[in-house]
């Protein structure tokens, strides 16, 4: 079993290695560069690293699963697809924060870029881990980087408050996850997910059922926090509002995608065998569905009363988290496909929306909804692109967001969970109100200023990709569906050929 | 016929041509924007008329059919879902398509009163036309839903930006009700997909017939699902129609939307409800409709009487027309509930006829409002002296509205009630009261507005201009043409309706 480090096929880890090298390089350069030197090119370096990592994943997309480091690290179809989504999202966010205009008062540019890189690295590790320890390391790498990023505008009180809240509540949630993981280890004697999968049934049947469930509940508490699902969502609005917009976009897109990768992997791989004991059906599904339903209801209902755009997006994100949980909860027939499709659509539209928010916020110097007033008269094209992406978030055809919801709805109905389908449908209609409030501001309200909104070129590219992706995936979802349909998801759930020792 | 296979697609997407040209016209060029906007409705009109001319009334089934596979959702343990881009026209859709293109063209002319943001107005207007035409021509339920939602979004903007004082509330209410309706529709369609494995209309017809041919399904687990789907469809299109008690949003839109949009809304959008009820309710679920027929008839009765009674007490001409629409939609429900050939024919006739009549009435209201600055009946008093032509057309429109023989409204109401009297003589008898009430409220409103004491402030008013008179006369001509020669409308739909009636066994 013991392999020398030299014999390990490190190429499977190339994306992570690129990211870690670039992050290290950035730290060193930041230290060596004189204080007055421009740090703008560090951002380009970071972007290059993320694009490079993404390209590597894209080129090797669809390859069979590879196990590394005694089975604690794995590149399989799930990891690859999640990684593509989050690397793509990160690249767009980096591109968005590159331009001179979009600095948002972030003074420590070098720090900002390498923290983003370490956060992406953590996210990337989370998608590829098959071991509780590596999962947790990835999670904490992502979390701690995010805490600092949230508070990177040291001189601003709201940024400080955001970071403070995020650290405290994030720490608590990590503790819950760790506590849950410790039960798993105690019950099965292993941290490897596939070993856990085999042994947890035994533990369940030999009188430790309550502990098995306790471990799951504790972890779900923490996961609920990480994906900002109700009722663990309280941090999201404050953190979203206080962070710089680029960081908010990162939290909304990359952090959330990574957290979903984590939830999917742990819940599905570790507890999969419980399906046969009907535990899934009787306990896990209702538990997840309640979280999903609560997220949809609370997220959409509270969003109605928001006047700050980023808070609105936070509640919208809470609601969207509820939608994405449905396929996992119901063990729908196209679980991975629909989850990934939705996350991809969500990333594209959310990044695009945040790019517009960033430009509008800078122009109006505040983040209230009224900053969007009359945008249509000032910059019709920006207003139109924003409209398309907001319509997509609301789930109006012919957009990616619609098809994503449609796909998830199929899962809910196929598994006969009609009540969650009904909740989805009703809350979606409710969500029209606040999404259309943005549209009302842009089209129905008079503009306070007459000048067109200034959009830096890099932001324009991000918005362009967001819109093209949103509409393109809405009209021709087949492009992605076909690729997703080709992947062998079952490999993810099955045990690797040579199960590693405890 | 193969050359014409793409015709429905051409008709549906031909407004794109106008949109494309509009994009290149600067925002300030109001004159040009108006002309191009109006011209943009001509290609679909011409193509629809070509389609109407090429349509073979004797042929059974769909004509100009087109079917391209579009989205394939891979699913484990099955071949997955195939959604297709399927378009085509049958007797039910052809007349509605022609009506849509005519009303759209005239409503574009009716948009002349608008003064601001014309570019986006006409872009949305043409987008709305694409949606409406697509709704009537789609042969796949998923595709139907997409077009349906396009009309929703376009109408929201048209009402919310260019409407009157309370436009935003109207737009919001429109969005809420219709959003809920579409959501129910989507749930129904997805469930249909699960039960029958397809969303293609022609395949669905075959598979539902197969299911209903075996009465055992009533005992099976599929029964509640089928009923659920059916009720969702009824409510979804009931909201759109609108059937009582889902009508409140429609009143607001009628009052607050800009005149041209009300022409479209009252003329075409409400008819999508009727179309959906017949196409997806009656045609796909015959045995269920039979069980619900009494309920539909009762709803129709409530619509007729409630709408008529409230139309009578309104003092705003727009509200009179709005409530009269509620009343007239009840007649469509009657026609459907009758479940026989005559009744269904009456329902479709009423859909088309009311489309033209209400478009005409709102065009006149817009012209009056433009001159007098009011739509309150009491304040209009004595218009006939200052504007004989407009008042004359208003009177003629009113006569059409109350169903004077020789005009389209009479034929439709006659057919619908004739169909209704066979299965439900009592309900039909009470419903007939609505016809009398219609005469009362229409004449009261029209007379009070045009005759009565002449007001001095009307001295300087000008009568209607040619650009207003022409569309009015075209509509009036169509209304009379259908009234005098109903075969024009009846012939193309005959075969299709007969097929539906055979399926429902009525």
Describe each model-derived feature in a short phrase.
Chain A
Residues 1-502:
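Alpha-helical transmembrane segments of multi-pass membrane proteins predominantly involved
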């Amino acid at each position: 079993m013991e392999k020398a480090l030299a014999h390990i096929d490190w190429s499977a880890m190339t994306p992570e290695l690129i990211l870690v090298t670039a992050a290290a390089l950035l730290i060193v350069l930041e230290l060596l560069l004189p204080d007055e030197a421009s740090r703008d090119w560090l951002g380009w370096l970071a972007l290059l690293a993320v694009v490079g990592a993404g390209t590597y994943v894209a080129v090797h997309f669809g390859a069979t699963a590879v196990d590394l480091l005694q089975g604690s690290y794995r590149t399989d179809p799930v990891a690859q697809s999640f990684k593509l989504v989050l690397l793509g999202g990160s690249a767009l966010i980096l591109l968005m924060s590159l331009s001179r205009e979009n600095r948002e008062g972030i003074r420590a540019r070098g720090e900002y870029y390498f923290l983003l890189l370490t956060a992406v690295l953590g996210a990337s590790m989370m998608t590829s881990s098959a071991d509780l320890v590596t999962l947790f390391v990835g999670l904490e790498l992502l979390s701690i980087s995010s805490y600092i990023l949230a508070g990177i505008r040291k001189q601003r009180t709201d940024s400080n408050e955001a970071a403070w809240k995020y650290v405290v509540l994030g720490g608590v949630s990590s503790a819950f996850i760790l506590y849950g993981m410790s039960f798993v280890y105690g019950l099965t004697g292993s941290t490897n997910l596939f070993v856990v999968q085999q042994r947890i049934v035994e533990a369940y049947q030999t009188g430790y059922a309550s502990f098995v469930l306790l471990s799951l509940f504790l972890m779900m508490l923490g996961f609920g926090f990480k994906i900002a699902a109700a009722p663990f969502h309280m941090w999201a609005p404050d953190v979203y509002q206080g962070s710089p917009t680029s960081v908010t976009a990162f939290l909304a897109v990359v952090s959330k995608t990574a957290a979903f990768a984590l939830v999917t992997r742990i819940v599905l791989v570790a507890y999969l065998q419980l399906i046969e004991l009907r535990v899934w059906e009787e306990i896990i599904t209702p538990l997840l569905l309640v979280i999903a339903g609560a997220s949809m209801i609370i997220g959409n209902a509270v969003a109605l009363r928001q006047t700050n755009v980023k808070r609105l997006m936070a509640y919208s994100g809470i609601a969207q988290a509820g939608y994405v949980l449905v396929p996992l909860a119901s063990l729908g027939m196209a679980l991975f496909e629909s989850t990934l499709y939705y996350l991809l659509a969500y990333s594209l539209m959310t990044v695009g929306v945040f790019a517009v928010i960033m430009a509008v916020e800078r122009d109006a110097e505040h983040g209230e909804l009224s900053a969007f007033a009359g945008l249509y008269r000032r910059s019709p094209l920006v207003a139109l692109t924003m409209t398309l992406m907001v319509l997509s978030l609301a789930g109006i055809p012919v957009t990616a967001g619609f098809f994503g919801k449609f796909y998830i709805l199929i899962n809910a109905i196929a598994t006969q969970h009609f009540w969650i389908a009904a909740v989805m449908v009703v809350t979606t209609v409710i969500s029209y109100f606040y999404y259309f409030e943005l549209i009302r501001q842009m089209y129905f309200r008079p503009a306070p200023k007459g000048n067109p909104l200034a959009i830096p070129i890099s932001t324009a590219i991000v918005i362009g990709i967001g819109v093209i992706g949103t509409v393109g995936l809405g009209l021709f979802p087949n492009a992605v569906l076909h690729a997703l349909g080709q992947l062998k998801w079952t490999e993810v759930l099955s045990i690797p050929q040579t199960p590693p020792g405890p | 016929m193969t050359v014409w296979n793409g015709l429905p697609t051409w008709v549906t997407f031909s407004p794109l041509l106008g949109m494309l040209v509009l994009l290149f016209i600067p925002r300030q060029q109001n004159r040009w924007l108006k002309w191009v906007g109006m011209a943009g409705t001509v290609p679909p009109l011409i193509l629809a008329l070509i389609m109407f001319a090429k349509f073979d009334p004797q042929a059974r089934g769909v004509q100009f059919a087109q079917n391209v596979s579009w989205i394939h959702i891979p699913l484990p343990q099955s071949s997955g879902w195939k959604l297709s881009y399927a378009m085509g026209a049958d007797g039910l859709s052809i007349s509605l398509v022609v009506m849509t293109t005519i009303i759209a063209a005239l409503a574009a002319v009716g948009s002349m009163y608008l003064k601001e943001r014309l570019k986006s107005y006409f872009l949305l207007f043409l987008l709305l036309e694409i949606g409406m035409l697509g709704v009537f021509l789609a042969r796949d339920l998923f595709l139907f839903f997409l077009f349906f939602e396009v009309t929703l979004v376009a109408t929201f903007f048209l009402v919310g930006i260019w409407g009157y004082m309370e436009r935003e509330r109207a737009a919001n209410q429109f969005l809420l009700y219709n959003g809920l309706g579409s959501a129910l529709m989507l749930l129904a369609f997805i469930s249909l997909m699960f039960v029958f494995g397809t969303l293609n209309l022609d395949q669905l017809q075959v598979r539902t017939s197969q299911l209903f041919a075996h009465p055992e399904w009533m005992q099976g687990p599929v029964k509640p699902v089928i009923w659920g789907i059916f009720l969702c469809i009824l409510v979804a299109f009931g909201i759109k129609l609108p059937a009582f008690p889902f009508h409140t949003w429609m009143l607001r839109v009628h009052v607050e939307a800009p005149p041209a949009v009300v022409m479209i809304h009252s003329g075409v959008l409400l008819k999508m409800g009727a179309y959906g009820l017949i196409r997806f309710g009656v045609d796909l679920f015959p045995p269920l409709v039979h069980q619900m027929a009494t309920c539909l008839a009762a709803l129709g009765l409530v619509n007729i009487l409630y709408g008529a009674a409230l139309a009578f007490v309104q003092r705003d001409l727009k509200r009179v027309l709005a409530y009269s629409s509620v009343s007239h939609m009840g007649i469509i429900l009657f026609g459907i509930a009758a479940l026989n050939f005559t009744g269904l024919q009456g329902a479709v006739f009423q859909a088309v006829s009311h489309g033209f009549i209400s478009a005409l009435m709102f065009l006149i209201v817009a012209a009056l409002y433009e001159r007098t600055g009011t739509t309150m009946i009491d304040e209009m008093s004595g218009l006939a002296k200052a504007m004989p032509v407009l008042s004359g057309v208003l009177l003629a429109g009113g006569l059409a509205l109350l169903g004077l023989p020789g005009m389209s409204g009479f034929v439709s109401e006659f057919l619908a009630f004739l169909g209704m009297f066979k299965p439900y003589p009592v309900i039909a008898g009470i419903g007939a009261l609505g016809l009398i009430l219609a005469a009362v409220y229409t004449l009261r409103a029209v007379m009070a507005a045009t005759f009565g004491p002449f007001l001095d402030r009307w001295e300087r008013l000008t009568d209607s201009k040619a650009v207003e008179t022409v569309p009015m006369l075209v509509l009036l001509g169509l209304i009379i043409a259908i009234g005098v020669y109903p075969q024009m409308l009846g012939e193309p739909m005959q075969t299709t309706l007969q097929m539906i009636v055979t399926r429902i066994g009525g």
